UniProtKB/Swiss-Prot annotation:
GO cellular component, one term: cytosol
Record key words, sorted: Cytoplasm, RNA-binding, Transcription, Transcription regulation, Transcription termination
Biased composition, class Polar residues, residue ranges: 163-173
Protein name: Probable transcription termination protein NusA
Amino acid sequence: MRIKLNTEDIMRISLFEKMTGANVIDSTSDDEKIVFVVKEGDIGAAIGKGGENVKNATDKFGKKIDLIEYSEDLKQFIKNIFAPIELEDVWVKKFGNDLVVYVRVHPRLRRAIIGDKGKNIDRAVDIAGRLAGVKNIKVVAGLRKDADNRPKKDEIPEKAAESSENVQAEENQ
């Protein structure tokens, strides 16, 4: 998938790569933070010993720095986007040409996944969309009782689909 970067993005990526030695695949930013998606296996170099590279980058850019390790495996990439929050399950459903990712989390972690006014989930959709063609990420809050309650063949249980739509509707209000 081709990513369009503006001049500011290119300069920011170049500077971060020089500071850390990590290969950056993509970067996005907002008023609060800068997110760098680094090549699989480069997360250690990006963080640096004792988090030194992240601290230096935070000082240099004047914003909080988030790092995400890229993965060709979409489910692993989604887990990496939300790390360190542990996702109980991730599954993908294709609707026509659109990929929709569903993530199941413990009910207590739902707010952390979605973020204040949906910022975290919006950022995740933006990054997953740019790099993996994901159109939407839906959060399903529920406890996983056993390994067999995961939808078969990436099918979505009706109750899970309904609750994930309700979660997004609640957050958009």
